[in-house]
Amino acid sequence: QDFKYRISDARKIARTLSAFANTAGGKLLVGVRDNGSIAGVKDEDDIYMLESASEVFLKPALKLEVWAHEIDGKTVWEIAISEGKEKPYQVDEIDGLKAYYRDGDQNFVANAVLKEVWKQDRLKESKHPVAFTDKEQRLIQYLKDYDDVSVSKAAKVMQLHRSKTIEILARLVRWEVINWTHDTQEGFKYRL
């Protein structure tokens, strides 16, 4: 769940909606400070900003469920965001479409592999390996020897173009052969 004192930036709220819809869903509480204290909704027009976040900046748009609660004489909005069925949910940013995911209480930009995982899930591609190709076996052996790999290193190991490498990494993630990690210093890494 996430707390918002108020909704003043539709694009920023769209990032949170994207992250929740692309992950496991969640709740957005408007009128609550970051420390959890109740401030109450100050501007009823915030609902239009919320609608704009979903309908203008989020692709595809989400249907939002909003409930108003009275707490200590103040109104708090509870917005339920379900895990989406049409992933990736992307935000129309100034520099193009970006999908977000949620980790703990933060939103992060999803990389191409994670977006490909969502695409393969949506297209109902097989979640079980039939057999590994030579290139996949080469990558798996590399991971046994060296622990983790980036997308660019995986492309070199398998001697493939980036786009094909992304497809393979996504498939191996979906098959639960490899896992991904992300940190702000090293970016996305893949390991057994």
Regions found by a protein language model. Give the residues of each.
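Conserved N-terminal catalytic/coupling substructures associated with nucleotide/phosphate chemistry
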Residues: Q1-L192
